Amino acid sequence: MRQTKRAFLEGLSAGLQSGGQIYVSENGRPVFEEAFGEVRPSESMTTGHLLPWMSSSKPVAAVAIAQLWERGLLALDDRVADHIPEFGTRGKESITIRHLLTHTGGLRMLDVGWPKAPWEEIIAKICHGRLEPRWVPGQTAGYHRTTSWFILGEIVHRADGRSFDQYVRQEVFEPLEMRDSWIGMPVETFTQNAERLAPLFDTQPGVPVELNWSSEKRVTRCSPGANGWGPARELGRFYEMLLTGGTWQGVQILLPQTVEALTARHRSGIFDKTFRQILDWGLGFVINGSNEDSRSGYGHWPSASARAFGHSGYRSSTAFADPERDVAIAILLNGTPDENSHLRRMRAITTAIYQDLGYA
């Protein structure tokens, strides 16, 4: 994987990151797993360190919702208010679960107060919020960073009884033997693993500044679409499960037809008001561009097929599966440069992986 290593080291030399992890599997078998650089000054990054997934966490919530759909506890076209009655006010009455998963709900602008505010207060604030002006649920599109994912987490809680963090730990991570992966890590686990948590650094021009993303509140207070933590190999395993029709080593997480539904193109050719460009979406997953416009922006996988699906996280991570190549990739970096530098960096690494595998 010479090209892959070179692409990572170029970013390191440019000061875009000081360390990171890359995991690649092909046909269900790991072909590359490596840690690069430093987790902290004078401390080497290892494959055992836990890195923040940021918004690369979002597909886990989509899988949780899909499991409850399979069990008959909800339907994708249920109104959110059918499950959270207090949500159905101030223009939000017609918003459905499908709208939340495709980022067409219209709740982008609320400041939910995480991580300071407790879960119940966050949910109440979103429920009291107003639909954005001139927004037609299901037709207007714009990426929702946190709001709709808290509501999806609350739907999981009300349908199943367990909190979202407990649910995904027990129904997704543990069956997949993702023992070091968490969304909302218990305080005692945080204390035990504090030295394994990799800090995130702002690497925009100037001296890198450590962000507070690895603080206790930001790690332990669950944000369903934003505060996943774990090693790259375990995030890659999540996508290996999806590539094999929802099953990993004989353990079924989803039915094959459910995986097909999640990763089909549900939103195509629609302008995204957050990213200011066309983006295609499945249910909780970015779908690689069906045309050059949608491949040129947020998508970090220019060499992947149009069927590739996954998600990226704030200027630092991406993870995806490419069904046409049977490849799963997870890249976790500890530096957050400016957006353009990050896009070039991530595209360089993913393109290099495809070159090393003989696909580009």
Where are these regions (language model features)?
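Short, surface-exposed loop or secondary-structure junction motifs
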Residues: 29, 90-303
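Short, well-ordered beta-strand elements
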Residues: 31-32, 319-320, 326-335
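A short, polar/charged loop-to-alpha-helix boundary motif
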Residues: 40-48, 338-351
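Short Pro/Gly-enriched beta-strand edge/turn motifs at strand-loop
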Residues: 3-6, 299-306
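Short glycine-rich, acidic/polar surface loops and turns
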Residues: 306-308, 313-321
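Short, conserved catalytic-motif segment at the N-terminal edge
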Residues: 1-54, 75-78
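Short, glycine/proline-biased beta-turn/loop segments that scaffold the active-site neighborhood
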Residues: 75-90
